[in-house]
């Protein structure tokens, strides 16, 4: 039997590392194996500085493009060895690359992901599909979010209103409403500000289980300032990233109130993440009064404090994780890029115009052959 295995490779806005998900598409998409490779500190810092400043030299940009491809290739080779697989066992790799800038508005809209796919295909010996977002933008879309199309394929049900919530660096939702077009969009800062703040004050990469945030108190004045951001008033479809929600943005907000203990800021940031999600969910129309199910994935799904606060606010929703529905919370996005590669190899449309704003559904990505 010919293999229908596709490997999704994803490094997100949190810059913590590379997620890999091997998915079998011979029948219903099935996650076969998954893994994670931490991002080296030097590379993470360089990428973080690039995203934060929005400027660099062509030399530095080119070198980061090369380094990322090497990281992806090494991650794939380790994955193959660990799971006793050969390159021939995989039809194609779907690699997102690393977003360093996303600017869907303006006279010349563009998005930029780096990580040389030519080098990745050559190093792994596996046909690679990359550069997914720009084709959607070429047809008038925002190039994001792309994952809702995968959510629709895997999680939709005619008997319920399902919202898939990914809390990664940025929080985004896919609204799978029976008898309506699927919509999906970014709703605010996910883990980005939480991670930035704890790294600044405690030198840690993230707040494990929300333990530090639990020691602080929610500050209502700061929360109101954070929520008073024009992005939240924009109608969907909309997208955002670290170019908005970053340390400079947060520190500017903090200058407008009296000094607070760092742990109180962290507690308030958790509530900010949760409230931005809750506000978005409250705006979803449900005229048929379908049962409402929230499926959470991404790093935030493993933060008990975030999950508790969501359940506190959403008493009329069933709050679950995608793991309970068959897809590990850590690897939903990586699995989505395996699906995007499958769609491209088969010349099938992979964007949802109702989500991205594109004028039509098209296949996404460029194919980089292994030879």
Curated annotation (Swiss-Prot):
Catalysis: reaction(s): 1,6-anhydro-N-acetyl-beta-muramate + ATP + H2O = N-acetyl-D-muramate 6-phosphate + ADP + H(+)
EC number: 2.7.1.170
CDD domains: ASKHA_NBD_ANMK
Top-rank taxon: Bacteria
Associated pathway: Amino-sugar metabolism; 1,6-anhydro-N-acetylmuramate degradation; Cell wall biogenesis; peptidoglycan recycling
A GO molecular-function annotation: kinase activity
Binding site residues for ATP: 12-19
Xref: InterPro entries: Anhydro_N_Ac-Mur_kinase (IPR005338), ATPase_NBD (IPR043129)
NCBIfam families linked to this entry: PRK09585.1-3, PRK09585.3-2
Cited function: Catalyzes the specific phosphorylation of 1,6-anhydro-N-acetylmuramic acid (anhMurNAc) with the simultaneous cleavage of the 1,6-anhydro ring, generating MurNAc-6-P. Is required for the utilization of anhMurNAc either imported from the medium or derived from its own cell wall murein, and thus plays a role in cell wall recycling.
UniProt-listed HAMAP family: AnhMurNAc_kinase
The protein, known as: Anhydro-N-acetylmuramic acid kinase
Gene: anmK
């Amino acid at each position: 039997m010919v293999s229908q295995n596709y490997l999704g490779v994803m490094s997100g806005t949190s810059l913590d590392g590379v997620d890999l998900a091997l998915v079998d598409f011979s029948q219903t998409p099935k996650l076969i194996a998954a893994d994670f490779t931490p991002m080296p500190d030097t590379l993470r810092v360089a990428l973080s500085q690039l995203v934060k400043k929005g400027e660099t030299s062509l030399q530095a940009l080119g070198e980061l493009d090369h380094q990322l491809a090497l990281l992806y290739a090494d991650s794939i080779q380790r994955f193959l060895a660990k799971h006793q697989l050969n390159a021939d066992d995989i039809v194609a790799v779907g690699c997102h690359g690393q977003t360093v800038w996303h600017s869907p508005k303006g006279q010349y809209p563009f998005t930029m992901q780096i990580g040389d796919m030519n080098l990745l295909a050559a190093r792994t010996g596996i046909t690679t599909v990359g550069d997914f977002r720009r084709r959607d933008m070429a047809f008038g879309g925002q190039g994001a979010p792309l994952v809702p199309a995968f959510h629709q394929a895997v999680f939709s049900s005619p008997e319920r209103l399902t919202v898939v919530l990914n809390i990664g660096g940025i929080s985004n939702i896919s609204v799978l409403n029976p008898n309506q077009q699927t919509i999906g969009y970014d709703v605010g800062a996910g883990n980005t500000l939480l991670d930035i703040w704890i790294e600044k004050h405690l030198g840690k990469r993230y707040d494990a289980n929300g333990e530090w945030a639990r020691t602080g108190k929610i500050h209502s004045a700061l929360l109101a300032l954070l929520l008073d951001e024009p992005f939240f008033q924009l109608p969907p479809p909309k997208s955002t990233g670290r170019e908005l929600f970053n340390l400079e943005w947060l520190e500017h907000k903090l200058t407008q109130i009296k000094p607070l203990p760092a742990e109180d800021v962290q507690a308030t940031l958790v509530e900010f993440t949760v409230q931005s999600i809750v506000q978005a969910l409250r705006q979803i129309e449900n005229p048929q009064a379908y049962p409402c199910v929230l499926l959470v994935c991404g790093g935030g799904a493993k933060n008990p404090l975030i999950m508790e606060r969501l359940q506190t606010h959403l008493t009329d929703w069933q709050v679950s994780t995608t793991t309970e529905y068959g897809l590990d919370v850590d690897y939903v996005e990586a699995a989505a890029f395996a699906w995007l590669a499958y769609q491209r190899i088969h010349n099938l449309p992979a964007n949802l115009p109702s989500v991205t704003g594109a004028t039509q559904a098209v296949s996404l990505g460029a194919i980089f052959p292994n030879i």
